[in-house]
Amino acid sequence: WDVDLANAIGAKLGVTVEYTISKFDNIIPSITGGRYGLGVSSFTDTVEREKQVDFVNYYNAGVLWAAQKGKTVDPDNACGLKVAVEAGTYEDTDELPAKSKTCTDAGKQAIQVLKFDGQDQATNALVLGQVDAMSADSPITEYAISKQSDKIEAAGKTFDIAPYGIAVNKGAPLTDVIKNTLQALIDDGTYTKILTKWGVQDGGVTAADVNAASKQ
């Protein structure tokens, strides 16, 4: 649904959005290097990432784990388990390292984090039983479950709720342009229609913001 939102922003501005598929952890360096104008990839806005780029906030999401159907996995008690993630995501860089450290500090086995270049690969690893669980942002996990509901299911509830943001080069005038355009889409109902189409209304916002993570 990120693509639908980006297309709506482009349409409102009278421009056509051009897309380049990239590994998640290459997107921010490509923005700061001038290769991409925007990064639209379900980015969790964090204070650390705000040091490199600005974020136009458009959604609130959390982390949601998934496990194979019928298997019980507790995200808060995952020591020694194999967990799939997409490389460079919040789950890879923040959530799982912290959880794994808690395990080892308590004398337990570390979480075995299996990193994949794409979310589809991480999901497939779970479907095939190569890992015990996967961790991803809640809309991503919910979508994966909807497509593989006979094989995987949610493990626990959504946690660590945080703002999503469209990444823009630090200090670029484009940031305010995107924010104002997003607000126009919220006000005219287009934004809600997109969220409803994809079944992700729960994290919708009523006002666009910039760098919300540093304001929390």
Predicted regions and their residues:
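Extracytoplasmic small-molecule ligand-binding "clamshell" domains
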Residues: 1-42, 188, 197
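Ligand-binding cleft/hinge of the Venus flytrap
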Residues: 7-13, 91-115, 145-149
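Short helix-initiation/N-cap motifs at beta->coil->alpha
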Residues: 18-29, 112-124, 162
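Short beta-strand-centered segments that line the small-molecule binding cleft or hinge
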Residues: 28-42, 49-62, 155
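A ligand-binding cleft/hinge motif common to bilobed small-molecule-binding domains
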Residues: 42-50, 96-97, 127-160
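Periplasmic-binding protein-like
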Residues: 60-67, 91-96, 142, 146-198, 201-216
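Flexible hinge/capping segments at coil-to-helix
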Residues: 67-86
